[in-house]
UniProtKB/Swiss-Prot annotation:
Function text: Lacks deubiquitinase activity.
Pfam families, sorted: Peptidase_C101
Keywords: Cytoplasm, Endoplasmic reticulum, Membrane, Nucleus
Name the UniProt record assigns to this protein: Inactive ubiquitin thioesterase OTULINL
Region of interest (Required for membrane binding), residue spans: 1-80
Single GO biological process annotation from the record: protein linear deubiquitination
């Protein structure tokens, strides 16, 4: 009887326990599922964040690399295609002076006073800086001849200057001209006549073109183009050197027949280093463009050969009679005038009035 009574209780207890287990099971399973899903999601998020971080780091490195390469190529192309003008654009004279001559040394004070003299007394407002090398005097003169559209000297109108190299050799027996040196190239040999002919031919062609051009702005644009080509420039300057040599040779032959010649040539041939055209070429002319520029007597010969009055403001001679000089000293009145300025008789720039 006792066992019979306890059976329902056991069944009731069993049903209660079973229900609790079912409830616990229903709670535990979703919890485990959610936990598993969370772990998977967290792992996925961490993986995604790691990939994103790596991707951002890669693109940042790529961006920096490409930026560096782009900057390098931009600089290269700018250097490659930028016009390397050997005669720069106009700069305000006093601003140029202030930039170049700072401090209170006696030299700096002298230069500032000289530039102020140019500005106030001679009305020079700007300066065109010229590339500093051993051709700068020739460059400064030729640039102004072309930019002003000056015509040929009278003697060049009467002769075909392209044939002058052969004329010196065959008509005047100057076989020593084979020792002519083309500035830093130091070229000598049997082909020197061909090289000189090409140089003189280029000078004649360019001079003819500029002198026939009436548009000032067009001449300026063409000058900027021409004076940014170093190879063409050198050929033009060698042509000018040869014309100087030709004039020296012509005057030397005239002196043999006791003809009256300009005093500057007597001074030239009185020097121990240039008693004749060959010595002048070997000891002076061949070095121009290579180890030295034009000295004062060379400037005289250049002005005489091109039939221009070269007025030079020698700033280091401020407050003296040699502050402004002409090459040659007694030019003919009808010769056109061009102006240069120098701080030391070695480097020349172009004043703009």
């Amino acid at each position: 009887m006792k066992a019979t009574r306890s059976a329902p209780r056991e069944r009731e207890r069993s049903r209660t326990t079973s229900g609790s287990d079912q409830v616990h099971s229903w709670i535990l399973v979703p919890s485990q599922v959610l936990h598993a899903v969370w772990r998977i999601a967290r792992a996925s998020v961490m993986t995604a964040l790691s990939l994103l971080s790596a991707t951002l780091s890669y693109f940042r490195s790529l961006y920096l690399y490409l930026g560096h390469q782009l900057k390098w190529w931009i600089g290269y192309l700018q250097r490659k295609f930028k016009r390397n003008l050997s005669v720069e654009a106009e700069v305000d004279l006093l601003s140029y002076c202030a930039r170049e001559w700072k401090g209170e040394t006696p030299r700096a004070r002298l230069m500032r006073k000289a530039y102020e003299e140019l500005f106030w007394r001679y009305h020079v407002k700007c300066v065109r800086p010229v590339k500093r090398d051993n051709y700068d005097a020739l460059r400064s003169v030729l640039f102004q001849i072309f930019s002003q559209g000056l015509s040929f000297p009278s003697w060049m109108k009467e002769k075909d200057i392209v044939k002058l190299p052969e004329k010196l050799l065959f008509s005047q027996g100057c076989n020593w001209i084979q020792q002519y040196s083309f500035g830093p190239e130091k070229y000598t040999g049997s082909n020197v006549f061909g090289k000189l002919r090409k140089c003189v031919e280029l000078l004649k062609l360019q001079w003819t073109e500029f002198s026939g051009m009436r548009d000032y702005h067009k001449r300026g644009s063409m000058c900027n183009s021409l004076f940014s080509d170093a190879i063409l420039e050198c050929k033009l300057y060698e042509a000018l050197k040869f014309l100087m040599l030709y004039q020296v040779t012509e005057v030397y032959e005239q002196m043999k027949t006791n003809k009256i010649v300009p005093s500057l040539f007597r001074l030239l041939f009185s020097r121990e280093s240039s008693p004749d055209p060959l010595s002048f070429m070997m000891n002076h002319l061949n070095s121009i463009g290579d180890t030295c520029g034009l000295d004062q007597i060379d400037m005289f010969i250049l002005g005489y050969s091109l039939q221009v009055k070269i007025k030079v403001f020698r700033l280091f001679k401020f407050n003296s009679r040699d502050f402004a000089v002409y090459y040659p000293e007694e030019p003919l009145r009808e010769w056109p005038e061009i102006s240069l300025l120098t701080e030391n008789d070695h480097q020349y720039h172009i004043p703009v009035f």
